């Protein structure tokens, strides 16, 4: 199979991603990507928006149980809000949870008092992100004892789905909005390259509930799209008989100098590359020793490496490109059994 890599290599891609933050950068930010090929602003903006709103993991309250309350249409003496209003207020509590749920939380208060989300007693792996959110108001002498169940998930789950089959009397299921993203909007403008205006500029504005930063939310969404689309790419298995992606197999009559040069690159250790300390440490922690180890990693695999981000990825891609290499290569017979001996021999040749 012959693959025309120009299909994707010659398309315009954003040179950088500009991030504009307002008063609260941990909750709201605008991402500006340019230049993009005409139509790609709409394509990427719509795809990111849909994934941001529907597919990110978060935490939410799934049910509550209030002392002396049998159902949500009840009322409590000395509590200004009825139970229906309390349920609506509980739905808006923003939680950040480490690990898996469900987790049981307790809330106890005595009036007069304004009961807020910050009054909920939580364990060390749960944090209330909007502690000033009002749940209800208690008059003099009134008491409120409530048990809340929090869980992790994605998207929106209606209250009917949160009611277990063996639900005890008095359990009130709550609609759960797990998504940490509250609003997403995008706008596509014209972008200029030289005298040409036939390019797109994508402006993506993301607002979260504070449990995740806008930067992380967009990164998660992009990663989800990347993983979902990866199944459609089959070039790694069918690029050429040599198994080297983007590199032609040498003919029998061709000179072996190109192959020898390639082997020299593959046998070099990654610590010989002029990489930033962060990138070098990430490779070391992932046990990537030789360039031959590195080039067989895909971009998706590299981004799964702890503390390895897009900036480090671009740095490594640029260094590999200067040697005629790239990520995602398939090197038959790698690593060779005598790799250390071969590497030492290469080093001696270079020194000699």
UniProtKB/Swiss-Prot annotation:
Gene Ontology MF annotations: DNA binding; DNA-directed RNA polymerase activity; protein dimerization activity
Record's keyword annotation contains Transcription: yes
Source species of the chain: Sphingopyxis alaskensis (strain DSM 13593 / LMG 18877 / RB2256)
Region Alpha C-terminal domain (alpha-CTD), annotated ranges: 257-352
Gene: rpoA
Lineage, top ranks: Bacteria, Pseudomonadati, Pseudomonadota, Alphaproteobacteria, Sphingomonadales
Domain of life per record: Bacteria
Enzyme class, first EC level, given as a word: transferase
SMART domains hit by this protein: RPOLD
BP GO annotations: DNA-templated transcription
Pfam families: RNA_pol_A_bac, RNA_pol_A_CTD, RNA_pol_L
UniProt family annotation: Belongs to the RNA polymerase alpha chain family.
Record protein name field: DNA-directed RNA polymerase subunit alpha
Keywords: DNA-directed RNA polymerase, Nucleotidyltransferase, Transcription, Transferase
Alpha N-terminal domain (alpha-NTD): annotated span: 1-236
Keyword Nucleotidyltransferase annotated: yes
Domain comment quoted from the record: The N-terminal domain is essential for RNAP assembly and basal transcription, whereas the C-terminal domain is involved in interaction with transcriptional regulators and with upstream promoter elements.
């Amino acid at each position: 199979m012959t693959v025309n890599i120009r299909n994707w290599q010659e398309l315009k891609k954003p040179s950088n991603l500009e991030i504009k933050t307002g008063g609260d950068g941990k909750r709201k930010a605008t991402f500006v990507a340019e230049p993009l090929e005409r139509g790609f602003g709409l394509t990427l903006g719509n795809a990111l928006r849909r994934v941001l709103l529907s597919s990110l993991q978060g935490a939410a309250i799934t049910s509550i149980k209030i002392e002396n309350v049998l159902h949500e249409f009840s009322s409590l003496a000395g509590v200004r809000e009825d139970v229906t209003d309390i349920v609506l207020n509980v739905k808006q509590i923003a939680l950040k949870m480490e690990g898996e749920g469900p987790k049981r939380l307790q809330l106890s208060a005595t009036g007069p008092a304004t009961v807020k989300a910050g009054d909920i007693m939580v364990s060390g792996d749960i944090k209330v992100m909007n502690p000033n959110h009002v749940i209800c108001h208690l008059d003099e002498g009134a008491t409120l004892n409530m048990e809340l169940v929090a869980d992790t998930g994605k998207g929106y789950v209606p209250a009917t789905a949160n009611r277990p089959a063996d639900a005890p009397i008095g359990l009130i299921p709550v609609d759960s909005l797990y998504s940490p993203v509250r609003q997403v909007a995008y706008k596509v403008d014209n972008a200029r390259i030289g005298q040409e205006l036939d390019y797109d500029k994508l402006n993506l504005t993301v607002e979260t509930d504070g449990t995740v930063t806008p930067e992380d939310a967009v990164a998660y969404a992009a990663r989800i799209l990347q993983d979902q689309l990866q199944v459609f790419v089959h070039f790694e298995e069918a690029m050429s008989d040599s198994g080297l992606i983007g590199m032609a197999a040498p003919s029998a009559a061709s000179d072996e100098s190109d192959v020898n040069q390639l082997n020299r690159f593959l046998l070099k250790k990654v610590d010989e590359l002029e990489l930033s300390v962060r990138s070098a440490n990430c490779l070391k922690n992932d046990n990537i020793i030789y360039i031959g180890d590195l080039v067989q990693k895909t971009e998706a695999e590299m981004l799964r490496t702890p503390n390895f981000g897009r900036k480090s990825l671009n740095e490594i891609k640029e260094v590999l490109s200067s040697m005629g290499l790239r990520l995602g290569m398939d090197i038959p017979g790698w690593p060779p059994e005598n790799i250390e001996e071969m590497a030492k021999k290469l080093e001696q040749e270079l020194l000699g």
